[in-house]
């Protein structure tokens, strides 16, 4: 069973810079791919650029390489979901004259997938991988030499199988997070005072969300 938990963590200025840059890169990648979908004919593409095409075609692009590979792919996938929703609404008439996905003016959240997250059972710390190009940029531009991001919160101790971590743009030394994690059964729920509701959420599948 998948659950989600929203929380926040305090971060150092160096971490704020790194996370902020990733959120900026994600918004730029979204806009590049969105422009391509809006204007694929003018760009000379033979067919409409779907997620499978875009995640490969932009793999060497600047903004893609400033993100962990799976995070960049997930950004492209979220755009793909937005376009699919637009076409469904257009076909079914669910909304009169629906608008296609918009370009992002501000930084957007980034999603770490399981392979980019290191978590020891019972630990209150997560270790997140950073892409090589981003590390080089941070070193050369800001003198920041972080190899990984380490986020700490006591709620991580009870999460044995973390599947995704959605990180929001930092503000005032804090960063909001949504943690998607797996539990093996429902018996644990009777002890934690949580209730459940269906939430399509920020992930690519329907999951159960836990609220305090």
Functional labels for PLM-detected ranges:
Residues 1-209:
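Nucleic-acid substrate recognition interfaces
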């Amino acid at each position: 069973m998948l659950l989600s938990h929203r929380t926040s963590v305090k971060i150092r200025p160096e971490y704020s810079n790194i996370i902020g840059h990733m959120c900026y890169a994600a918004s730029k990648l979204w806009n590049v791919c969105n422009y391509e979908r809006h204007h694929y004919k003018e760009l000379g593409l033979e067919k409409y650029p779907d997620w499978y095409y875009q995640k490969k075609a932009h793999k060497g692009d600047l903004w893609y390489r400033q993100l962990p590979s799976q995070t960049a792919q997930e950004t492209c996938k979220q755009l793909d979901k937005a376009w699919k929703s637009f076409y469904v609404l257009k076909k079914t008439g669910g909304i009169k004259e629906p608008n296609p996905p918009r370009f992002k003016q501000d930084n957007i959240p980034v999603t770490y997938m399981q392979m980019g997250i290191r978590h020891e059972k019972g630990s209150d710390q997560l270790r997140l991988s950073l892409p090589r190009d981003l590390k080089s940029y941070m070193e050369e531009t800001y003198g920041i030499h972080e190899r990984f991001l380490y986020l700490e919160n006591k709620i991580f101790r009870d999460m044995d199988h973390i599947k995704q971590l959605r990180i929001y743009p930092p503000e005032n030394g804090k960063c909001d997070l949504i943690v998607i994690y797996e539990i093996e059964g429902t018996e644990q729920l009777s002890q934690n005072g949580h209730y459940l509701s269906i939430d399509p959420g920020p992930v690519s599948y329907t999951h159960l969300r836990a609220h305090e």
